[in-house]
């Protein structure tokens, strides 16, 4: 793909998300979602391998179904209220349909099956875009209509997503699938909280994007495709291994790292609203995710799998020996620094919530 075409597609992805964020009209909101989806498809199949194309087709089919459901909701709303305004409340039928459509776009249970396969079939950078930027537009729609949705249903789907994300990642050895199930679990945390506090959910989404960016950039820099690659990282790059451990533990939510803020402010919000059972189930579900986070950390820092010397040296490719500053390196440094020094930012986040 020519570089100019790629830049135009990236600009359209950004523009589609901005249209959704600034929309007060159902039709322009739907147009923004479609611009976002259609522009990301050529980027997903950038390398044009069979696996990339397969993932792009899966993503297109899922997003097409979701867009069709959203369009049906838009038409029903316009027919009922003779208005395209987002301020009009949803009824019971359109509320359920909108929950289903947003669940498909966000990868919530029970509409999460497509997400790990799509992430596994694309590169790390494309997977990062799907896990972070592509969540912003549907999350904005969720914020617009959250007052009309069934909060109990949304919280239940969020809890089940946390459990499924933790359970699904236990048996995985491919790093991209582990990150995909981790993303499902984190989106479950955010959706469980958004019905009780939109500001808390927005802060959680920003924190998740920062932490996930550091993990994906690091995995892309060292080409960590599986747990066996992680086990060889610390032998040749101690700093990289230590950075991966800190980023993974931050993603798992261990204090005093930045990821702890996601769990802390969510539990604080739920307890203040009297949702003690919901908070307890979320904590137990996060323990499942923490298990495979710790497994990655142990493989990176404490253990080294037995292997032949030829296998070890074949892993040391030239891509890890390039010098100079790159945009990816700058983004990695910034996101890793924030994700590692989380409690330094705690007063800022508390002031944002008050």
UniProtKB/Swiss-Prot annotation:
Glycoprotein among keywords: no
Reactions mediated catalytically: a ubiquinone + NADH + 5 H(+)(in) = a ubiquinol + NAD(+) + 4 H(+)(out)
EC number of the protein: 7.1.1.2
UniProt entry tagged with the keyword Ligase: no
Subcellular location: Mitochondrion inner membrane
Superkingdom, natural source: Eukaryota
Bilayer topology: Multi-pass membrane protein
Listed GO MF terms: NADH dehydrogenase (ubiquinone) activity
Keywords: Electron transport, Membrane, Mitochondrion, Mitochondrion inner membrane, NAD, Respiratory chain, Translocase, Transmembrane, Transmembrane helix, Transport, Ubiquinone
Bilayer-spanning residue ranges: 5-25, 26-46, 60-80, 96-116, 122-142, 149-169, 198-218, 242-262, 274-294, 330-350
Biological processes, Gene Ontology terms: mitochondrial electron transport, NADH to ubiquinone
Assigned GO CC terms: mitochondrial inner membrane
Similarity remark: Belongs to the complex I subunit 2 family.
General function of this protein: Core subunit of the mitochondrial membrane respiratory chain NADH dehydrogenase (Complex I) that is believed to belong to the minimal assembly required for catalysis. Complex I functions in the transfer of electrons from NADH to the respiratory chain. The immediate electron acceptor for the enzyme is believed to be ubiquinone.
Protein name as catalogued: NADH-ubiquinone oxidoreductase chain 2
Organism expressing this protein natively: Patiria pectinifera (Starfish)
Gene (name only): ND2
